[in-house]
Amino acid sequence: MLFRDIVGQEAIKEELFRGHKKGRIPHCQLFYGPKGCGSLPLAIAYARMVLCGEEVLSNQACNLRVSELKHPDLHFIFPVANSQEFKTKAISANFLPQWRTFLHSNAYASLYDWFLSIGIENKQGKIGKDEVSDLVKKMSLKSYEGGWKVAIIWMAERMNLSATNKLLKLIEEPPKKTLFLFVSEDIRSLTDTLISRCQKIELKPLSSKKMSKALVQKGYSKEEASGASVKSTGNFNEALKFVSNKVDEKMFEEWFLSWVRSAFAVRKNKEAVLDLVAWSKNISKTGRETQKSFLSYSLDLFRQSLLKNYFLDELTTYSPSTDFNFESFSNFISGNNIDAISVELETAYSNIQSNGNSNMIFMDLSLKLTRLLHKK
C-alpha cells in the first residue's frame, strides 16, 4: 500500500513524507480519526516507506513483501477472541492469514467487519496481555533486514489495562530502530500515559468529493459514486458498502421501525409494552457488536430526524428503504428531546460494551424512549 493509494489526507501524507526524508521518525506515533477515514491504510503506507524507502522501484522485493503483508519486520496487533479454531489464548498471530485476506479486500473496513470475517461477531474482541507478550518477543529480536522493525496496533482502544501497561514498558525503553504505530477510532478510551508517549496524527473525515473520485477510479459511475459519498458522511468504508449493496442498513431500519412504532403505541395501549419486551428479547439474542452497531445507527437516525424537522434537508443523507414515514417521524424529534435521547443511546452502548445484560439494557432504553418521544 502506497501513499497514492490512500483517499485524501494529502496534508498528513506530505508531513509524513517530509519527516521521513529528514530522518525524523518518532518511535511511537498515534494515528487517530473517525471510522472510515483511512488511519489504518495510512499507517501501513507509512510503515512501507520506513521499511523500504521512498522510491518504490528501488527496493521492489521489500515493497512486494509489505504489499502482501508478509514482511518479516512488519508486525500487526489487532482485537481477537477465542473461536472454534483457537479455543484458548487467541492472539493476532493465530489469525494472520485471515487478516491479510481481510485487508486486501478492504483496508478501510470496520472492527465489526473484522469480527464478522473471523466468526466472532457475537463476542467482544480485545487486545490482551498475551498479545503484548508475543509482540515484546518479536520486537526484541534482531531485524531480519538489518533496518527498522515496525508494529502496527489497530484499534488500540481495545487494549485492556494490563496489556497497555506491559506495552508502555517496551515503548519507554524501546530497542533501537523500533517503530510503534497505534491506530485508534476512540482516542478518549486510551490512557493518558500512552497518549503522552506518542506523536499524535489526527485524521479528519473524508470529503464527499475525494471519496467520489476514488469510487470512480474503482470503476463505479459518477452517479453511484456521488450518491454513496454523500450518504456515507466521510466514511469510505460505508461508501464502498453503499455502492456494493452490502450495508446492513435495511435490517437496522426494520428493527428501528418496529422499535419506535411499539414505543409510540404504548401511550395509547399499555399492552404494547409486551411488544417492546419481545423486541428487546429478540435483539438481545444477536451479538454484542451487532447490538452496538444498531445503537450507532439509531443515534445517527435520530440526529438525521432532527435535521429534517428543522428543514435542513441539504444536510440530511438518510433515505428510507422500507415503508418508514421519515418526515412524519422527524416531527417528534426536536431540541427538547434529542440531547436526552442521545445520552440514553450512548449509555446503552457503553453498558453493552461493558458486558451488561443486553435484554435489560434494551428494555430500559425502550421504556425511556416511550417518554422521550413525546417530550415537548
Report the location of each language-model feature.
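Conserved catalytic/switch belt of AAA+ P-loop NTPases
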Residues: 140, 165-176
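Conserved adenine-binding aromatic site and its adjacent loop/helix in ATP-hydrolyzing domains
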Residues: 137, 169, 196
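Short, surface-exposed loop and linker segments with low hydrophobicity and enrichment for Pro/Ser/Thr
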Residues: 159, 168-172, 289-292
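Structural recognition of the conserved hydrophobic beta-strand(s) that form the central parallel beta-sheet
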Residues: 150-154, 167, 178-184
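Charged, glycine-rich active-site and insertion segments that engage polyanionic ligands
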Residues: 1-68, 176-179, 185-297, 301-376
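Clamp-loader machinery-focused feature within the broader ASCE/P-loop NTPase space
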Residues: 2-158, 162
